[in-house]
C-alpha cells in the first residue's frame, strides 16, 4: 500500500539517535497505527513493546534480530518482523525510508 486514507498524522516527529532516526505516527480510524520514518546511514539498536512489521520502502540495510547470530540484508520492498518485548539492530548502509506497523 503506497498511501493511506482517512488517517490522522501526528505533526511532531519522534527523534532518536541525535536526529539520525525520525518518525511520525499515522493513526487509523480503528485506532491502529503505523510510523513512517527515515534512518540516516549508521548503526542503531531498537527495543520493541509490541510486535512490529518493518517495511523498507527505500534504501539498503542489514538487520540482526535478538538471539540471531547472522545479519540479514534487507532492501527496497522487503520487510521483516520483530516479536513483542524484543530488540533488533540495524546497519543502515544508505538512507532508509521505512514504515513500521504495530501489531497488537
Curated annotation (Swiss-Prot):
The keyword Glycosyltransferase applies. It catalyses: a purine D-ribonucleoside + phosphate = a purine nucleobase + alpha-D-ribose 1-phosphate; adenosine + phosphate = alpha-D-ribose 1-phosphate + adenine; cytidine + phosphate = cytosine + alpha-D-ribose 1-phosphate; guanosine + phosphate = alpha-D-ribose 1-phosphate + guanine. The keyword RNA-binding does not apply. It holds the Pfam family Ppnp. InterPro entries: Ppnp (IPR009664), RmlC-like_jellyroll (IPR014710), RmlC_Cupin_sf (IPR011051). GO terms for molecular function: guanosine phosphorylase activity; purine-nucleoside phosphorylase activity; thymidine phosphorylase activity; uridine phosphorylase activity. It comes from the Bacteria. SUPFAM superfamilies: RmlC-like cupins. Keywords: Glycosyltransferase, Transferase. Its EC number is 2.4.2.1, 2.4.2.2. GO terms for cellular component: cytosol. Belongs to the nucleoside phosphorylase PpnP family. PANTHER family: PYRIMIDINE/PURINE NUCLEOSIDE PHOSPHORYLASE, PYRIMIDINE_PURINE NUCLEOSIDE PHOSPHORYLASE. Catalyzes the phosphorolysis of diverse nucleosides, yielding D-ribose 1-phosphate and the respective free bases. Can use uridine, adenosine, guanosine, cytidine, thymidine, inosine and xanthosine as substrates. Also catalyzes the reverse reactions. This is Pyrimidine/purine nucleoside phosphorylase. It comes from Colwellia psychrerythraea (strain 34H / ATCC BAA-681). The gene is ppnP.
Amino acid at each position: 500500500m503506497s498511501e493511506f486514507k482517512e488517517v490522522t498524522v501526528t505533526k511532531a516527529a519522534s527523534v532518536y539517535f541525535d536526529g539520525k532516526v525520525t518518525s511520525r505516527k499515522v493513526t487509523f480510524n480503528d485506532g491502529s497505527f503505523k510510523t513512517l520514518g527515515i534512518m540516516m546511514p549508521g548503526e542503531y539498536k531498537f527495543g520493541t513493546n509490541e510486535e512490529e512489521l518493518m517495511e523498507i520502502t527505500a534504501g539498503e540495510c542489514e538487520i540482526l534480530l535478538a538471539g540471531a547470530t547472522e545479519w540479514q540484508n534487507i532492501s527496497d520492498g522487503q520487510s521483516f518482523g520483530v516479536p513483542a518485548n524484543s530488540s533488533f539492530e540495524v546497519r543502515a548502509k544508505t538512507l532508509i525510508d521505512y514504515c513500521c506497523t504495530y501489531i497488537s
